UniProtKB/Swiss-Prot annotation:
Keywords: Mitochondrion, Ribonucleoprotein, Ribosomal protein
Organism: Brassica napus (Rape)
Alphabetized Pfam families for the sequence: Ribosomal_L16 (PF00252)
Cited CDD domains: Ribosomal_L16_L10e
Keyword Ribosomal protein: yes
Protein name, as recorded: Large ribosomal subunit protein uL16m
BP-aspect Gene Ontology terms: translation
Source organism phylogeny: Eukaryota, Viridiplantae, Streptophyta, Embryophyta, Tracheophyta
Subcellular location: Mitochondrion
Length: 177
């Protein structure tokens, strides 16, 4: 089967994170400081204000279970990584058999690719924009940031509940039907 460049871009649209695989189209991703994911380099180091984000990724695309955001907001790269680790930690700690460990897969469908800038405390106004301090991902209402497959419904619900406490936005559990 011949794949065009556009179809390859669509296939690599979402960030797929498992224990051994990291891929994202258009970015050079680096794992630094405790496996935190953000772009290695960008064309411009400081971001601009956008006009909003379209609700893309509102349906399950890879797994059978997922978490859906109930309101729009921002997710920091630390919150994304903490939620991913909470999900993986629950899955691997509570596993009763090795079959569960081999079959469990987790997809993170958001990437913190927007830089956040800030100025130091007690600095006067003016003199340009501040230095980049962190990375965020914009999440729209109904977007699915995390998906999982290869687990039972009860374990998936429990893992989604643990992961929901990490980001600052409210989420709900969804199931493919």
């Amino acid at each position: 089967m011949y794949l065009t460049r556009k179809s390859i871009m669509l296939l690599r649209k979402y960030l797929l994170v498992t224990e051994s695989q990291v891929s994202k189209c258009g970015f050079h991703i680096v794992k630094k400081k405790g496996d935190v994911l953000y772009p290695k380099r960008t064309k411009y180091s400081k971001g601009r204000c956008s006009r909003g984000c379209k609700p893309d990724g509102t349906k399950l695309g890879f797994g059978r279970y997922g978490t859906k955001s109930c309101r729009a907001g921002r997710l920091s790269y630390r919150a994304i990584e903490a939620a991913r680790r909470a999900t993986i930690g629950h899955s691997f700690r509570r596993a009763m058999s090795g079959q569960f460990r081999r079959n469990c897969k987790i997809w993170v469908r958001v990437l913190a690719d927007l830089p956040i800038t800030g100025k130091p405390a007690e600095v006067r106004m003016g003199r340009g924009k501040g230095n980049p301090t962190g990375w965020i991902a914009r999440v729209s209402t109904g977007q699915i940031p995390f998906e999982m497959d290869g687990v039972s419904l009860a374990n998936a619900r429990q893992a989604a509940r643990l992961a929901a406490h990490k980001p600052c936005s409210s989420t709900k559990f969804v199931q493919w039907s």
